[in-house]
Curated annotation (Swiss-Prot):
It comes from Prochlorococcus marinus (strain MIT 9211). Mn(2+) 2 binds at K257, D262, D281, E343. Presumably involved in the processing and regular turnover of intracellular proteins. Catalyzes the removal of unsubstituted N-terminal amino acids from various peptides. The keyword Manganese applies. It holds the Pfam family Peptidase_M17. Its main location: cytoplasm. Binds 2 manganese ions per subunit. GO terms for molecular function: manganese ion binding; metalloaminopeptidase activity. Its EC number is 3.4.11.1, 3.4.11.10. The lineage of its organism: Bacteria, Bacillati, Cyanobacteriota, Cyanophyceae, Synechococcales. The gene is pepA. Keywords: Aminopeptidase, Cytoplasm, Hydrolase, Manganese, Metal-binding, Protease. One of its GO terms (cellular component) is cytoplasm. Its cofactor is Mn(2+). This is Probable cytosol aminopeptidase. It is found in: Cytoplasm.
Length: 493
C-alpha cells in the first residue's frame, strides 16, 4: 500500500473513501470541514439515519452519488480529554473493516494535533495495514476482497512523511509473524521455520546459522533435544544476526519459543487444553523472526541483535521423553521432567544459555509459556518478568508506544522452593499456584547474573478468536512491534 501525506487536508481532495474522526460534542463545528466535499443537506440526512454523538465506536457512513469521495465514514473518538493514541488505532481499524470490499484511495482525517502528529500518523498507518490483513493461503479458491491501494493521511505536516517509511517494514514483520503462527503444523515444520529464517537473512543481509541435531548434541543441548526426541522431524536451532554499520553501542538478544506443534507429550493435552490449537506454540519464535524481518529492512544504527530460536515438535513415540526423566542442559544444570507438557521452558533453557554465551547487554525471550498467565492477565496483556528495572522501563515504553499490552509480574524468589527436586538440580514445573511465576523463575536459572534479562509470556495475546482492535480474528503477530521499538531504543541504554 502506498502511503502519503496531504498537507491541505480536504481542500481539493478527491479520493475514493474518506474516514473522518469526530470528537464527542460540538459535532456541528467539526462537520463544517466536510462542506468542502458534500452539502449540509446530505450530512444532515446521513446523521438522521442513526444517532451519532461522537462516542467511541460510533460509526456512520453514507455515499455521495456521482462524486468523489464516493463514501464518507464517520467514526466517533469519544472525549478529547480521555483520548489516547490506541483509541486512534482502534477507531481506524473499525473504519477499515467498514470499507473492506472497496478499492481506490482511502483518506483519513483525524484530530492529529491532540498528539504528536508524527507518532499519530505512524500509529494510524500501521492500523490500516494490519486491520486489512487476511490469511487465505490454504483455501482452494481464495476470494480476494477489494481493498484500497493508496492511503492518504490528510492535514498532517510534511515532516511526518519521514516516519511513514517505517510503517511498511514493521507491518511486513507483523504479517510474517501472523502467517507463521497461522500455518498448520504439517506446513510449518521445524525445517520450514528454519528455511523461512534463512530467506529473511538472504533478503536483508543478516548472518544465518542453522544448527541440526548433531550440532545441538555437540553443544550439549540436552534439555532442548529431550523435547524433540519424540518427533520424527529433526530439531533446528536458528541463529540470525543483525549488525549495524559503524560503531556498535549495544548488543542484545531476542529469543523465541519455537514449538511448531505441542501434543503435551506423555502428559497429553486433553479436554479444554485445545490440542488442535497447539500450532501457535511457536508464537514467540514468530515474533522474533518477524522482528528480524522488520529490523533487517529498517537497519537501525548502533546495535547488534541476535535472533535465537530452538524449534522442534513435542510428540509421542517410542523414544519420547518420560515423565520423571532427568536431562542435562547445556549450562550443566540437571532437570527432572515432572511434566512433559512444560516443554517450552526446556527448549528455552538451552536457547538462553546459548544467548548468554554471546555476552549480550540484554536478553528478551518471548514464549507462549503458561496457561496461568492467560488466567491472570487475559487476552490483551502479556506478562513481563525481569531482573532489570531499566530493561523493564525500556520494554514497557516500547510496548506502550505501539499499543501492545505489557504488565509486569513479580519474580518472587521464595517461589523457587516449588522447583526443588529430590534427585536433580531443579524440576521443570512447580505447584499449580503461581505457575507463571515459577515458569519465569525456572528460566532465570539459565541467565548469568550480570546480564539484564526479561521474559514475556504471550500465551494469551498471540491469538484472538474474534476481531479485536487492529487484529483480525486469528494470529496477532504480538511482540513484533515491541521488539522493533526496543531495538531502536537500545542505542540509548
Amino acid at each position: 500500500m502506498q502511503i502519503s501525506i496531504i498537507q491541505k487536508g480536504l481542500e481539493g481532495w478527491r479520493g475514493s473513501i474518506l474516514v473522518f474522526g469526530l470528537l464527542e460534542g460540538a459535532l456541528e463545528s467539526q462537520l463544517n470541514a466536510l462542506k468542502e466535499i458534500c452539502t449540509p443537506a446530505s450530512l444532515a440526512k446521513a446523521l438522521q439515519d442513526k444517532e451519532f454523538v461522537g462516542k467511541q465506536g460510533d460509526l456512520q457512513s453514507f455515499q455521495l452519488i456521482g462524486k468523489e469521495p464516493r463514501e464518507i465514514v464517520l467514526i466517533g473518538l469519544g472525549s478529547a480529554e480521555k483520548l489516547v493514541l490506541d483509541d486512534l488505532r482502534k477507531a481506524t481499524a473499525i473504519s477499515c473493516r467498514k470499507v473492506i470490499g472497496q478499492e481506490g484511495t482511502l483518506g483519513i482525517l483525524l484530530p492529529w494535533d491532540i498528539f504528536d502528529s508524527d507518532i499519530a500518523a505512524k500509529a494510524v498507518g500501521e492500523a490500516v495495514i494490519l486491520s486489512f490483513f487476511k490469511d487465505n493461503r490454504f483455501q482452494k479458491d481464495p476470494k480476494q476482497k477489494k481493498l484500497p491501494n493508496k492511503l492518504e493521511l490528510l492535514g498532517l505536516p510534511e515532516s511526518s512523511q519521514k516516519y511513514l517509511s517505517e510503517i511498511v517494514p514493521i507491518c511486513s514483520g507483523v504479517k510474517l509473524a501472523r502467517e507463521l503462527v497461522g500455518a498448520p503444523p504439517n506446513s510449518l515444520t521445524p525445517s520450514a521455520l528454519a528455511n523461512q529464517a534463512k530467506e529473511i537473512a538472504n533478503q536483508f543481509g543478516l548472518e544465518a546459522k542453522i544448527l541440526g541435531q548433531e550440532e545441538c548434541q555437540a553443544k550439549n543441548m540436552g534439555a532442548f533435544l529431550a523435547v524433540s526426541q519424540g518427533s520424527d522431524l529433526s530439531p533446528k536451532f536458528i541463529h540470525l544476526t543483525y549488525r549495524a554499520k559503524g560503531e556498535i553501542k549495544r548488543r542484545i538478544a531476542m529469543v523465541g519459543k519455537g514449538l511448531t506443534f505441542d501434543s503435551g507429550g506423555y502428559n497429553l493435552k486433553v479436554g479444554a487444553s485445545q490440542i488442535e490449537m497447539m500450532k501457535y506454540d511457536m508464537g514467540g519464535s514468530a515474533a522474533v523472526i518477524g522482528a528480524a524481518r522488520a529490523i533487517g529492512e529498517l537497519a537501525p544504527s548502533g546495535v547488534e541483535i541476535h535472533f535465537l530460536v530452538a524449534t522442534c515438535e513435542n510428540m509421542i513415540n517410542g523414544s519420547a521423553v518420560h515423565p520423571g526423566d532427568i536431562v542435562k542442559a547445556s549450562n550443566g544444570t540437571t532437570i527432572e521432567i515432572n511434566n512433559t507438557d512444560a516443554e517450552g521452558r526446556l527448549t528455552l533453557a538451552d536457547a538462553l544459555t546459548y544467548a548468554c554465551e554471546l555476552k549480550p547487554d540484554a536478553i528478551v525471550d518471548l514464549a507462549t509459556l503458561t496457561g496461568a498467565c492467560v488466567i491472570a492477565l487475559g487476552e490483551e496483556l502479556a506478562g513481563l518478568w525481569t531482573n532489570s528495572k531499566h530493561l523493564s522501563k525500556e520494554l514497557k515504553e516500547s510496548a506502550e508506544a505501539c499499543g501492545e499490552g505489557l504488565w509486569e509480574m513479580p519474580l518472587q524468589d521464595s517461589y523457587k522452593e516449588g522447583l526443588k527436586s529430590m534427585l536433580a538440580d531443579i524440576k521443570n514445573t512447580g505447584p499449580r499456584a503461581g505457575g507463571s511465576i515459577t515458569a519465569a523463575l525456572f528460566l532465570k536459572e539459565f541467565i548469568k547474573e550480570d546480564i539484564a534479562w526479561a521474559h514475556i509470556d504471550i500465551a494469551g495475546t498471540c491469538w484472538t478468536d474474534k476481531d479485536r482492535g487492529i487484529n483480525p480474528a486469528g494470529a496477532t503477530g504480538f511482540g513484533v512491534r515491541t521488539l522493533v521499538n526496543w531495538a531502536s531504543r537500545s542505542i540509548n541504554p
